[in-house]
């Protein structure tokens, strides 16, 4: 017989990496197996984790349709047609055939890369939230009884098509429904017609019938057809989620915290653990390979593997010298593996590090590896700011933040990148050129454009360089470089800061603006101030009748007779006479003039024949020419301020800010020698690149729409039948194919070849050239093009009348000229054609030949002009309607694919606008793309086309962070490198990682999935740390993510992805944590085991932990627009139209942050009724889904990504001096908190009408079965000793399913109320990673937002405490104005002095004689706590201290003690908390509560201590156990009352 030692020896001898299997392999295995058969059989233990949604799963067909809709609505509708009847169950005998049918239908519209992304997306179930959102919106309608599908017409529902007509007749009387971004709108020919929303399930016959009838009604222009998914009878199974991590951390067993209660295991479906699990290498044996080679030895191989696993999983601690090089040794081990397995090895080592570490300590590290890593680290630090040990991931140069980015946002990045890369690929750009072009930064710069202020139209009030009042100021620009205190405004005799007020004198805001200008002047602010008065500019206007003209002439009179400064004083005097809110009148002007200049005839100044009329016409001309937008306008160095910045208080602040900001700009210019002393400063400012002749908001707006120009085909507009059959992208390609361009110098490849004539700017002018406005637009474009060699122009006709020969002469003449003439002749001829006199002559019957120009082939021109083919105009008109979505005759300018318009009928778009447009394109994208295209060496016309198409593609990308340029040094010895497949587009993926960090645990599995999904060039650089002094990873980890849906052997869908921890060591104590995306709130729902204390030696086979996604968070930031500060204590509610207040929250002062718990659907955000709604109103909102002017703020949650909104609020006019928190107690109106407090036995507290002062609120936290057992005993001790009614508040985040199920039953038996509260740790607050420290954080960091405002005071009682007195006494204890009271640590047990850390060092000096308090029991006055912003102060201090891992070792206790000077603590009398560790035995008899503190000297387990120290503890324990037995019996008999178990499925709880 072999001993276990022999077997180990055999295993060790076999432990060599087996890659090539040598001939005696069979012999080796036979020997090893022979030994192993005698070993005792022991079952392998495992832990599994799954996560599902609360809502039911929708058919995958619907999710696939949403994937396509994200690409385009056109693809969505095509897919809907292609997938008819897929949903009918009789079509498919298995899940796999159903899945394959979906893919087959979808693949028609997708490239190979997108096909993979679709499979991944279906595996992630990322669109299940979108379908559920539609489902919730449908339920809100609500659906008519017994209908599988239904229609909603302006709020009226029906499922009978017959009644549709009558509903349509009355529809205009009802308001149109609010449509959302995710709605599927069928292309409509008449946007004004009624909206019909069809709720149905695609893929079914019933859907198809109604759908086709609605399409024909839409095509006839009778309806606007909108489709929303709706499943009348969903399958009753949840969605299995992935994209999260599961951590199994090893717990310290210094203090035993395990419950000794026996747990019955549940039946677990063991098939969850597959035979061919990928973790397949044990001690060098590749078992997957061995099973393939020796199928007959399956059983023996299984035994052999198990033995090897058990021998490896011993976890003896390592010596400090063994730890030092673990990071480098792990890197060496990974890099030694064959390149295709390196990621597998990295995943295996990082995710199972505690059991792998010992073997790794034997790995040798080569000098080259070490040197290369250290060399690269200098570079990482210098260019991307990474320290040794840090991690980073870049995809095509985009930084993917592993801490904040979840898999769903990463998926979006992959998809966006695929669009661009495939677009470039379709345009024939490949390989390295593709990546170089992709990395061009062509995002529109955030430049503030400025207009030229060197205009005679401006009347300057002062001039800093000339006026005597500034004589004492220094005039040298070198003064700018002299150091001053921060924020000091330098007074220099130069016109560095110029402010121009463009005003209409009779506008009511003008008086305020004049007084601000006056304030700047009188305070000697270094500003040159000027005015432009925009008034009536008709020839003969009488200033005695027109107040605006009167102000202008009076100003000019004084300016001319005296000077600008006195003219301005006169202006202020005029406006001083005007009462607030009134307008200036002629008599105001007359009275000031008569008083100041009594000797002058006022009529001669103001009247029709006034000699003081300068600038009147120029002023309006300047205003219209610069296009600066509606009056009033204030320019700072030519840059217009935003409208909201013109508020008087705001304007003052923002101007000071601008002065300081531009000072920095000038300092730099002087320092670099760009601005010298003798230069004219204003000239210098006006020569900056951001100065343009005209500001056109249409051109400068951030919202931009682009054509997709990436398709290619061989169709043209002169074949209308073919053209009309193309899809949008195909039509655009045909339009581009058919274009002939006008260019300067008439150079095109037909005549002369010169590669410098790639023209980076292409304008397509869209309009009706047989109408004056269309001709004018084209004329201005041609005029501009004559001045620029960068531009080419072509036309698209959008006729406003029925198409016929007589209605289109100019359009046909332009087309014929472009088809038949040289570029130069065509240009000259077309310029003639768009003049008004030509159109008039043609209309009068003059022959078109009369207008021919020199060098023109007239007969060829006439032949084309007179042919009867109108295809090109028909195609153009169809294109305008279907793709550009224009009405007949509307004008648009398309510049490099960007659609500007439609322009209003009277809107000016002139030569200056074309100039501005060209400037912007050249600066942001045109030149950069042109220089890359030049390197491709394609001919000129093709090159200009390419610039246009590439620009449209790149510019259409959502604005994100700039791509990072990285040129890493060495990758010979320290990087994993995977090459992409040749000839296909590939992603450039770079990762930097230390293989023994938490980031590596997530990154390795992620990269493995990406490798199966996408073609990529991958480089993973090792970023190791040296000289480790601690074990770098103390946890096992699994990342749940699969590239495609998996199936069982019988072709059914597998039960969804799960995390599997197989072959785990049995001796350690584990705690299980989920690592989910930031906006998910998950809870443990089904497991009898204690997930906080998993001890595998006591488990039968499998610990199966089931979690549920309880809520998706809606997060936001809120500011008061008046103060710019967060409105602390403001409350929001979130609900639906049927149930307006489902949840409620409070705004924090930190960043104005708030969070609300929701689920997929459409939600309405409101201010909470009561003080919030009385004092404030919502002013504006951003990131929401309703139009800015809508009454309700609607927010749609329809995906798994974070949703963060911004809300600005404003105090109501009569509430300006009210304070939200001054009287928070009045919030007890029948608002939300009352509407669903779950009282005992699940009742709402309204029925238990209790005066709130007569209730004691007790808060506690617990995690793990032992502490929940203590918690129940603590509650019992409170109830036995307290006569006043009690309400318990528990932190829900970490409670076990067992506790949540039992608590309603206990509440009913002992007649108390309880509530579960929860809050998600905000993403911006420094995160803790250890579960115990997270729970400590919840004890102190969120007290102001965890409870409703109606709770004034609460007591915190630790779970392991026993109460021996009535807690009413503590509740009523006078805190002397402090926000909270804590008990100080006892000093009486002298033998513990060595452990009292607060008596020396940092704590002794910080406390300065004050006591150090224990956090096991405290009382909080929430009104005071909120009033002094204690929560915000505590979070602020925590944020600073927690960055240092060595501070706040007892977070919940150290933080309030550290803040004792800012947030005072009232010390409670010592008897309120007795604990044996610190207090002597004599004081025990006075104890009001006993706490089972840990004893650092004896390390006695909690349970033993409880029994020994507290005599009544065992009685309480027995009493609860009997109640639990009773509960179990009733549960098994099914006699539990419904409401007693309701908590488990409760729909909403408060924060």
Swiss-Prot record:
Keywords: Endoplasmic reticulum, Glycoprotein, Glycosyltransferase, Phosphoprotein, Signal, Transferase. Its EC number is 2.4.1.-. Its cofactor is Ca(2+). Pathway: Protein modification; protein glycosylation. CDD domains: GT8_HUGT1_C_like. Residues 1244-1551 are annotated as: Glucosyltransferase. Glycans are attached at residues 269, 536, 1015, 1228. Optimum pH is 7.6-8.0. This is UDP-glucose:glycoprotein glucosyltransferase 1. It comes from Rattus norvegicus (Rat).
């Amino acid at each position: 017989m072999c001993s276990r030692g022999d077997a180990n020896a055999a295993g060790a001898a076999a432990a060599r990496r087996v890659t090539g299997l040598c001939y005696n392999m069979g012999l080796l295995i036979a020997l090893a197996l022979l030994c192993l058969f005698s070993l005792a059989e022991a079952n392998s233990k495992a832990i599994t984790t799954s996560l599902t949604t609360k809502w039911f799963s929708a058919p995958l067909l619907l999710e696939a349709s949403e994937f396509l809709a994200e690409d385009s609505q056109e693809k969505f509708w095509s897919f809907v047609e292609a997938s008819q009847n897929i949903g009918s169950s009789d079509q498919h005998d298995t899940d796999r055939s159903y899945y394959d049918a979906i893919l087959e239908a979808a693949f028609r519209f997708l490239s190979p890369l997108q096909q993979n992304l679709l499979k991944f997306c279906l595996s992630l179930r990322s669109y299940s939230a979108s379908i559920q959102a539609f489902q919730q919106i449908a339920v809100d309608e609500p659906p008519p009884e017994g209908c599988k599908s239904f229609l909603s017409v302006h709020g009226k529902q029906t499922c009978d098509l017959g009644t549709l007509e009558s509903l349509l007749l009355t529809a205009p009387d009802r308001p149109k429904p609010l449509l959302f971004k995710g709605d599927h709108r069928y292309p409509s020919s008449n946007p004004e017609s009624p909206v019909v929303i069809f709720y149905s399930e695609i893929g079914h016959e019933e859907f198809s019938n109604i759908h086709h009838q609605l399409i024909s009604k839409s095509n006839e222009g009778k309806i606007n057809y909108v489709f929303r998914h709706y499943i009348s009878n969903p399958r009753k199974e949840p969605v299995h989620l992935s994209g999260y991590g599961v951590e199994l951390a090893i717990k310290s067993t210094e203090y035993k915290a395990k419950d000794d209660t026996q747990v019955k295991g549940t039946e677990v479906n063991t098939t969850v653990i597959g035979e061919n699990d990928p973790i397949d290498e044990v001690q060098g044996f590749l078992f997957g390979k061995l099973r393939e080679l020796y199928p007959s030895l399956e059983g023996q191989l299984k035994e052999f593997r198990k033995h090897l696993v058990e021998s490896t999983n011993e976890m003896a601690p390592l010596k400090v010298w063994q730890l030092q090089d673990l990071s480098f040794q792990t890197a060496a081990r990974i890099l030694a593996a064959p390149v295709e397995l390196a990621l597998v090895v990295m995943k295996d080592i990082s995710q199972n590090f505690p059991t792998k570490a010992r073997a790794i300590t034997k790995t040798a590290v080569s000098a080259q590896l070490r040197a290369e890593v250290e060399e690269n680290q200098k570079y990482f630090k210098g260019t991307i700011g990474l320290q040794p040990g840090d991690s980073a991931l870049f995809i095509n140069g985009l930084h993917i933040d592993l801490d904040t980015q979840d898999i769903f946002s990463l998926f979006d990045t992959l998809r966006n990148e695929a669009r661009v890369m495939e677009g470039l690929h379709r345009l024939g750009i490949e390989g390295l050129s593709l990546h170089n072009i992709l990395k061009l930064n062509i995002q529109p710069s955030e430049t503030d454009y400025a207009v030229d202020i060197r205009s005679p139209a401006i009347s300057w009030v002062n001039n800093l360089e000339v006026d005597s009042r500034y004589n004492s100021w220094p005039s040298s620009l070198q003064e700018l470089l002299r150091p001053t205190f921060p924020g000091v405004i330098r007074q220099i005799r130069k016109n560095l800061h110029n402010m121009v007020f463009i005003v209409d004198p009779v506008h009511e805001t003008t008086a305020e603006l004049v007084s601000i200008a006056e304030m700047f002047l009188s305070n000697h602010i270094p500003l040159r101030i000027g005015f432009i008065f925009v008034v009536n500019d008709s020839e003969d206007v009488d200033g005695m009748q027109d107040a605006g003209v009167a102000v202008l002439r009076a100003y000019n009179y004084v300016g001319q007779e005296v000077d600008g400064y006195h003219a301005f004083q006169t202006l202020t005097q005029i406006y001083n006479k005007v009462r607030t809110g009134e307008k200036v009148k002629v008599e105001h002007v007359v009275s000031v003039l008569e008083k100041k200049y009594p000797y002058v005839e006022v009529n001669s100044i103001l009247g029709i024949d006034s000699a003081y009329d300068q600038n009147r016409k120029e002023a309006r001309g300047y205003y219209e020419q610069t296009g600066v937008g509606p009056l009033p306008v204030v320019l700072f160095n030519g840059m217009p301020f935003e409208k909201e910045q013109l508020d008087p208080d705001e304007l003052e602040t923002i101007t000071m800010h601008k002065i300081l900001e531009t000072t920095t700009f000038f300092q730099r210019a002087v320092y670099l020698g760009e601005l010298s002393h003798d230069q004219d400063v204003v000239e210098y400012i006006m020569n900056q690149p951001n100065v343009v002749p005209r500001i056109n908001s249409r051109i400068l707006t951030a919202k931009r729409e682009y054509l997709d120009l990436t398709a290619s085909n061989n169709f043209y507009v002169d074949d209308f039948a073919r053209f009309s059959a193309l899809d949008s992208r195909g039509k655009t390609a045909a339009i581009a194919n058919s274009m002939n361009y006008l260019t300067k110098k008439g150079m095109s490849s037909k005549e002369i070849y010169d590669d410098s004539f790639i023209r980076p700017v292409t304008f397509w002018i869209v309009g009706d050239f047989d109408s004056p406005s269309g001709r004018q637009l084209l004329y201005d474009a041609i005029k501009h093009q004559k001045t620029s060699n960068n531009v080419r122009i072509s036309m698209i006709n959008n006729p406003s009348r029925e198409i016929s020969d007589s209605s289109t002469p100019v359009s046909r003449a332009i087309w014929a000229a472009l088809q038949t003439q040289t570029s130069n002749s065509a240009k000259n001829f077309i310029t003639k054609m768009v003049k008004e006199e030509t159109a008039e002559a043609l209309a009068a019957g003059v022959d078109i030949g009369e207008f021919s120009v020199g060098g023109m082939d007239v007969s060829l021109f006439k032949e084309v002009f007179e042919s009867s083919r109108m295809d090109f105009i028909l195609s153009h008109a169809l294109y305008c309607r279907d793709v550009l979505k224009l009405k007949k005759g509307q004008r648009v300018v398309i510049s490099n694919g960007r659609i500007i318009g439609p322009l209003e009928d009277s809107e000016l778009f002139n030569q200056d606008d074309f100039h501005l447009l060209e400037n912007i394109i050249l600066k942001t994208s045109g030149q950069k793309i042109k220089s890359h295209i030049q390197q491709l060496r394609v001919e000129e016309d093709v090159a200009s086309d390419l610039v246009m198409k590439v620009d449209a593609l790149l510019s259409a990308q959502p604005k994100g962070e700039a791509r990072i340029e990285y040129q890493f040094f060495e990758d010979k010895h320290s990087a994993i490198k995977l090459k992409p497949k040749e000839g296909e587009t590939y992603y450039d993926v770079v990762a930097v990682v230390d293989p023994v960090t938490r980031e590596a645990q997530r990154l390795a599995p992620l990269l493995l999935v990406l490798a199966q999904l996408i073609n990529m060039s991958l480089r993973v650089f090792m970023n190791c740390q040296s000289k480790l002094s601690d074990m770098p990873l103390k946890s096992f980890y699994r990342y749940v993510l699969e590239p495609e849906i998996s199936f069982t052997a019988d072709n059914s869908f597998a039960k969804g992805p799960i995390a599997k921890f197989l072959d785990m060591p049995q001796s350690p104590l584990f705690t299980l944590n989920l690592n989910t995306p930031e906006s998910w709130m998950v809870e443990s729902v089904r497991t009898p085991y204690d997930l906080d204390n998993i001890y595998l030696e006591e488990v039968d086979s499998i610990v199966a932990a089931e979690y549920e996604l309880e809520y998706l968070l809606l997060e936001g930031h809120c500011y008061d627009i008046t103060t710019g500060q967060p409105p602390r204590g403001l409350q929001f509610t979130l609900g639906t139209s049927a149930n307006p207040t489902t949840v409620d929250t409070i705004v924090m002062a930190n960043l104005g942050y708030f969070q609300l718990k929701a689920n997929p659907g459409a939600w309405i955000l409101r201010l909470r009724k009561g003080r919030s709604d009385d004092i404030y109103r919502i002013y504006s909102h951003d990131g929401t889904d309703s139009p800015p002017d809508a009454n309700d703020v609607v927010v749609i949650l329809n995906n798994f990504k974070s949703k963060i909104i911004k809300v600005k609020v404003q105090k109501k006019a009569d509430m300006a001096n009210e304070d939200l928190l001054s009287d928070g107690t009045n919030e007890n109106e029948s608002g939300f908190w009352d509407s669903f407090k779950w009282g005992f036995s699940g009742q709402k507290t309204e029925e238990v009408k209790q005066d709130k002062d007569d209730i004691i609120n007790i808060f506690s936290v617990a995690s793990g079965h032992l502490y929940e057992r203590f918690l129940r005993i603590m509650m019992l001790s409170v109830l036995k000793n307290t006569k006043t009614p009690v309400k318990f508040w528990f932190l829900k985040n970490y409670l076990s399913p067992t506790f949540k199920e039992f608590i309603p039953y206990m509440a009913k038996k002992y007649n108390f109320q309880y509530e579960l509260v929860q809050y998600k740790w905000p993403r911006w607050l420094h995160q803790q990673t250890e579960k115990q420290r997270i729970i400590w954080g919840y004890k102190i960091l969120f007290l102001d937002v965890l409870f409703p405002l109606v709770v004034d005071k609460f007591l915190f009682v630790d779970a392991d405490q026993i109460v021996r007195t009535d807690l009413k006494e503590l509740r009523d204890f006078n805190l002397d104005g402090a926000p909270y009271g804590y008990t100080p640590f006892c000093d009486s047990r002298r033998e513990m002095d060595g452990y009292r850390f607060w008596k020396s060092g940092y704590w002794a000096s910080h406390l300065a004689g004050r006591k150090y308090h224990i956090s096991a029991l405290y009382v909080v006055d929430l009104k005071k706590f909120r009033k002094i912003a204690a929560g915000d102060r505590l979070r602020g201090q925590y944020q600073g201290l927690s960055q240092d891992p060595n501070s706040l070792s007892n977070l919940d206790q150290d933080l309030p003690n550290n803040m004792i000077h800012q947030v005072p603590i009232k010390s409670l009398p010592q008897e309120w908390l007795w604990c044996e560790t610190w207090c002597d035995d004599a004081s025990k008899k006075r104890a009001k509560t006993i706490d089972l503190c840990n004893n650092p000297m004896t390390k006695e387990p909690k349970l033993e201590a409880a029994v020994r120290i507290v005599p009544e503890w065992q009685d309480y324990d027995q009493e609860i156990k009997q109640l639990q037995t009773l509960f179990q019996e009733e549960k098994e008999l099914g006699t539990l009352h419904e409401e007693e178990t309701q908590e488990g499925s409760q729909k909403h709880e408060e924060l």
